[in-house]
Amino acid sequence: KAAVSSDFCVASRLNIYDGFPYPYGFGVSENGGVEPELSEAVKLVGILHKDLGLPLLDITIGNPYFNPHVNRPADIQPYESPEDPLVGVARMLACTKTIQDAYPDLVLIGSGLSYLRQFAPQLAAGGIENGYFKLAGFGRLSFADPDFPREVLAGRELDPGKCCITCGKCTQLMRFGSMAGCVIRDPVYTRLYQENVNSKEKRV
């Protein structure tokens, strides 16, 4: 904070639950299992918000390299998911609400909403109205349909044909070391994806 002007908003993104057992996983019970146990996460957020003055925090859970079904609920995963993606969405919401309930004045950003596709704005609105978070963050849906906020503000329903299909190819682009975007909806990223796949095949 000392390095920036007073009108600069300092924010952070924080993983509050790893989704794998103690002692390697954060946000789980020391007694075993992988159910969320967020007492340490609540304390950590308190340090960031109350002690250090952090005003804006984006919450995430899971590890995209180990358990992407926790981190990004999707229909298409690199392995058979052990749960319905809606279970993952519900977990994300519950974890976020635990933090928001502990610090009602903290501006919290909810994540993991893109799985709901054209219904994601309704989930976001309900989450805000019911105190789960104060802002809704969208990653995959914003890649697929960059104009979706305009549609929401105009009171129009989202076109399912423009929404994210949760295929994970935007993540693959990042792992290629490339720029990320929607491979399905944007031909620029379709070509970029194919170029990276072809390049990888040649190296193999």
Give the label of every model feature segment.
Residues 1-204:
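Flavin-dependent oxidoreductase catalytic cores
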